[in-house]
Amino acid sequence: DGSGGASDAQKQHDVNYLLFKVYEDVNDENSP
């Protein structure tokens, strides 16, 4: 089922995006 793979890929993309946003926020807080 190809649709299942696409769904997993989308979930992985969402997770990566959320982690990226959190990483950005942490860097902003640590900036002088």
Curated annotation (Swiss-Prot):
It is found in: Secreted, Extracellular space. GO terms for biological process: oxygen transport. Its main location: secreted. The keyword Transport applies. One of its GO terms (cellular component) is extracellular region. It comes from the Eukaryota. The keyword Transport applies. One of its GO terms (molecular function) is oxygen carrier activity. Hemolymph. Keywords: Copper, Oxygen transport, Secreted, Transport. Hemocyanins are copper-containing oxygen carriers occurring freely dissolved in the hemolymph of many mollusks and arthropods. Belongs to the tyrosinase family. Hemocyanin subfamily. This is Hemocyanin C chain. It comes from Cherax destructor.
